[in-house]
Amino acid sequence: MEEFENKLIIDGNIFYYIDLKKIISIYPKLKKLPNTLKLLLENSIRNTDKSFHSQIIDSFINKNHEFDIKLIPDRLLLEDLDGIPILCDFASMRDFLKNNNLNETKLTPKIFIDLIVDHSLEVESVSTKYSCNNNLKNEISSNYERYKFLKWASKTFENLNIVPPGFGVGNQINLEYLTTIVCIKEINDKKYIVPEFIAGTDSHITMANAMGVNTINISSIDALALMLGEGISIQIPKVLGVRISGELDDFVNDYDLVMNLTNFLKEKKSSCKFIEFYGEGIKKLSLESRATISNMANEFNADIAYFSVDKQTINYAQKTRDVDVHFIKEYYELQDLINDENENLEYDEILDFDLNLVKSCIVGPKDPYSKVLLDKVASKLESFKRGNILRDNDIVLASINSCLSTANPFLMIQAALLAKNAIENGLDINPNIKASFTPGSKTVEKYLRQLNLLKYFEKLGFNISGYGCGVCYGNSGSLYPTIESEIENYKLNVSSVSSGNRNFSNTLHPLIKSNWLMSPALVIAYSLKGTVNFNIKADVISKDIYLKDIWPTNEQVLEYVQLINFKHFSTSYYSLFTGDSHWLEINEVNDTTYSWNDKSTTIQPFWEIYENQYYDKINFNNGRIVSVLKDNILCENIISFSIPKKDSLTFQYFNELGFHIDNFKNIERMKSNKFLLKKRLFDNENIQNILCSKVGAYSKEIESNNDINFTDCVEIYKKSNVPIILFAGKNFGSLKNSDAVAKVFKLIGVNVLIFESIDEDFRKNLVKMGILPLKLENDSISSLSLTGVEFVNIFAEDLSVNKLIEIEIIQSGIVNKVKVRILFKTINEIIYYKNGGFLSYLLKNVV
């Protein structure tokens, strides 16, 4: 590392850094590397042995997208839905160490962690001045056990900060306060300046890309690895350069921009996973405007949506954090990473996007990609049934929410001024609508109150109902009772309007099929009418008032933006890690290990997934097939966190505990409950085990030839030390929950998965859990004609990457030899597998 080292003296203090200019002077072809890749190069060089440096640099020069680079983030950002299960896993590792007569207190996170409790706010109380406090009080009461565990973790583990509920959304808090852009790290007794690199479990962590910070969305398994001091590996990504030109028209705002851009990028179907924005047009975009764009990277299939550091970045850091930013500016200038236009950099692909062509729109009704221009909405509607007090397309839920829009002062003030104009014209929202306002931080409430604008939200019923994800994540609470009855009785297709980034059918509320995304100002405007079935640009809203009569000009909005006292951005966070009185009342437990409750529905240890064995070869004899699945099985169907049906095994489990599932809208909060996850496995009407006649969580009991509960069948084999094998067709295990599925497969004792093809993230998670992934080389599920009575023998020595072997499938004494490929893609994966999985390896070799 010293060969590329340089030093910077600030106020008499010596700081070292990896000098990208020095590297580029030796390897000039790197000069045109996109800035986001230069940041990856710096991290990889800094965290890799010198003997690998030339190989790393050559791979960047030659754009070797198959080459794995090792990265070590500086900080881990967790939300509570994934963060609590991760901490439960970490706590259970302490149990594992203690049970093996090792010092459990040595196990503490090796990376700085900020865990923000933001996904558990249930928006039940709305439209009163007490709503915020009532919802917070109810949240802490209903999540008491989860939060008690968090308080224990914060007292027990070093490097862990907990942001209690009631402060906002993690991504917005990160943008406004936590992100530092550069970090100081101790390396070999030297102080190093490094560009901040953040890993996190929320898919919208990319919001920090707007500040020139690289981020990576990771699985819970990778998060645990980081906590144990291990890095993460990614292949050098392709980078799409998006050249921005022009500027937005007066009626168009940043929300319109990001939805137009999302639609544009989805249609282009680029293969690049990193996006870097540049061009003259970005000079017209505020930092908050860029953050609105970066937030949606996941929706346009990108891992990063990056803006290089420039004057906007430096100014935003200075005004929101009240810190001396010369340190940041000097570092990025030294590294040649401040670049307003990036015209001379080489991208794998380039697309042009003209801001002048952006049109005001809404998005929906069932995905965040389908842009609809305002004058075309009515023509996109499909059903027009009537009830007694409602019709199809009537709005029953309106929410100003999400870090996507509430982190943008322009959008917030625009909505406030529209509300003001509506009130002054005698307008009000439709009384059938449940309205709520859940900002992503307390900063929003402070500057709206300072500008005397909050009262206009409140007068229309958009009182602040809490600070968190709320409706955006589906925690919308109940609709008004008469409204719910009306929808169910007449089977109506009603609508929600919100300023978030999620709108798949039934995700915001189980009774709402059509969910429309739009800017906060349009949320209010549509709520004044009470339906989406009209042309909001041309038709009367009410009382001869049109949208143009109440829509504020950009100049009017910007006048207010200039008046914001940005000290609110630092003062709002003074008690960020302390919490309010509700949080402080939660009992604290002081012990080196956690006292688990076997009957808990939310907090359970997973120590059973760790092994203290070593396997030098693969040797499975007389394995039994417990499931044969068709093509395109999704992980979110294998383990679903939707409300279970009353005839499901999950519902029966809760009944046995005396737990009323009807009162618990989001069982995803129970991700740490190993018993629930086992019951939830395959408990879905979209899953059909080919071996069985019944749909869902069933397997074939061979002796009786009856369908029995899947986990019961697996348990029988596990107790007898019989290898447990699953077969699947093409495209097995895509979409979310793949880490949870891999963990539960390990927990119940699955040894081998054999498939035609598999999702890559799922494959990686299986290997990390010590489960053998085998790809059928020439055969298919249909050609094998499996019945479940077969025995399977699998043997392999001298394991290597993508090794081809033959397995034996035996039925009635007849041996069918089938070629399969062991899908280990790196030497490290083989090492992890031999140790019983990634986490077991780390426990044995790192801890």
Language-model-derived ranges and their functions:
Residues 190-325, 329, 413-434, 463-570:
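Mobile "lid/hinge" segments at catalytic clefts and subdomain interfaces of large enzymes
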Residues 274, 278-285, 501, 713-758:
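Extracellular/luminal Protease-associated
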Residues 543-552, 762-832:
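Acidic, glycine-rich flexible loop/linker segments
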Residues 428-477, 734-736, 740-743, 750-774, ...:
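Extended C-terminal subregions enriched in glycine
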Residues 49-243, 258, 358-371, 375-462, ...:
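Long, structured ligand/cofactor-binding scaffold of large enzymes
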Residues 72, 90-145, 276-379, 537-591, ...:
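Terminal amphipathic helices with adjacent charged low-complexity linkers/tails
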Residues 1-72, 86, 583-584, 591-596, ...:
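Acidic/polar, glycine-rich intrinsically disordered N-terminal extensions of enzymes
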